[in-house]
């Protein structure tokens, strides 16, 4: 693991790739906006779905993508924690649920987080921490039940006393020959690397109709540095 400043830089880059295209069903059929005050005490659910691509191509694990020059790249893991999720507007609806989003997962459930028990009403956006909040990061996997993604020991650095906020692992084919021989591993963690993300979006939570939004993630943009891309051959570890 490199310096906190270096990892903070990667965390900010990850937020840049999470310049989401937001879509989905979040209003009632008539388009009526309902405030939390109008349905006081009623709860509803929201599914946040993450849809990944690599440039213009659909994203998947173990698939080769053109990178820079002759190089090709494939990924075995792209995952990140999100915590402190809140719907924002005139009022707020907070969730204490944590999510571990695995864009290379084999199931749709690994790319989603389902939030339950949210106060019904109309909201104008969603906020979350990309990573693990300092309060939660003081804890360790043994402090959480098995159903909580923060219970996973593979997502925690014992020596650093921190969760691994993001992990991007894969292989590079240096010559575009079909031989993926060079590995790389990018990981971020520690309190300085958690980043707050705010996305504007009309969201209506109703008891009778679970809502959903989709966040579009371009993984290629994570590696972009000006007019070129991060050198995964010269600097494969972070």
Where are the model-predicted features located?
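A short, solvent-exposed, low-complexity linear motif enriched for acidic/polar residues
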Residues: 26-238
């Amino acid at each position: 693991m490199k310096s906190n400043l270096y990892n903070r830089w990667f965390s900010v880059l990850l937020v840049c790739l999470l310049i989401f295209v937001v879509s989905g069903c979040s209003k009632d059929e008539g388009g009526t906006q309902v405030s939390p005050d109008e349905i006081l005490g009623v709860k509803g659910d929201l599914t946040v779905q993450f849809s990944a691509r690599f440039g213009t191509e659909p994203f998947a694990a173990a698939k080769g993508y053109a990178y820079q020059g002759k190089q090709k790249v494939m990924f075995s893991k792209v995952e990140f924690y999100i915590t402190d999720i809140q719907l924002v507007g005139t009022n707020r609806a907070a969730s204490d649920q944590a999510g571990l989003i695995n864009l290379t997962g084999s199931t749709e459930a690994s790319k989603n987080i389902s939030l339950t028990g949210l106060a019904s009403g109309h909201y104008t956006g969603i906020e979350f921490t990309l990573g693990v909040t300092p309060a939660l990061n003081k804890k360790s996997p043994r402090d959480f039940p098995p159903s909580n993604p923060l219970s996973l020991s593979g997502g925690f650095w014992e020596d650093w006393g921190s969760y691994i906020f993001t992990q991007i692992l894969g292989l590079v084919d240096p010559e575009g020959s079909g031989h993926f021989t060079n590995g790389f591993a990018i990981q971020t963690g520690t309190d300085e690397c958690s980043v707050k993300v705010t996305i504007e979006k009309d969201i209506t939570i109703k008891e009778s109709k679970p809502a959903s939004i989709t966040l579009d993630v371009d993984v290629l943009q994570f590696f972009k540095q000006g007019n070129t891309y991060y050198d995964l051959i010269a600097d494969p570890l972070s």
